[in-house]
From Swiss-Prot:
GO cellular component, one term: cytosolic large ribosomal subunit
Record keywords, A-Z: Ribonucleoprotein, Ribosomal protein
A single MF term (Gene Ontology): structural constituent of ribosome
SUPFAM superfamilies per the UniProt record, alphabetical: Prokaryotic ribosomal protein L17 (SSF64263)
Name the record gives this protein: Large ribosomal subunit protein bL17
Domain of life: Bacteria
Record's keyword annotation contains GTP-binding: no
PROSITE patterns in the cross-refs: RIBOSOMAL_L17
């Protein structure tokens, strides 16, 4: 008997799916907002929320664990210094998804994923 998977496969092989999610998460943290299909954004949201939760405690171990997923040092530093301090008091729900409707051409459900609160302006 088949049971429901805990994630969406996105019609890709595991290496392609992982690379897609990694690139989308990096773009999300870089621009603090991303637009794509609703299905892809559900998976990006799951990863992004886990990474923000991990980044709330700034330790060497957590930085090394997140650097396995985020290879850009600027984005990694931004996550630890600007994004995660805003969410220290929040126990989850760091992102929101705004549905845009159907895309012209293939009628795919489109959406925008953004952070609930704006990151700190640290200079």
């Amino acid at each position: 008997m088949k049971t429901k998977l805990g994630f969406n496969r996105l019609s890709r092989k595991s290496s392609h799916r992982r690379a897609l999610l990694k690139n989308m998460v990096i773009s999300f943290f870089k621009h603090e907002k991303i637009s794509s299909t609703k299905t892809k954004l559900f998976e990006v949201k799951r990863f992004a929320e886990r990474l923000i939760t991990r980044a709330k405690v700034d330790t060497v171990h957590n930085r090394r664990e997140l650097s396995k997923f985020i290879h850009d040092k600027y984005i990694l530093n931004k996550l630890f210094t600007k994004i995660s301090p805003v969410f220290r008091q929040r126990s989850g729900g760091y992102t929101r998804m705004i549905k845009l409707g159907k895309r012209y051409g293939d009628a795919a459900e489109m959406a925008i994923l953004e952070l609930v609160e704006k990151p700190l302006k640290v200079e």
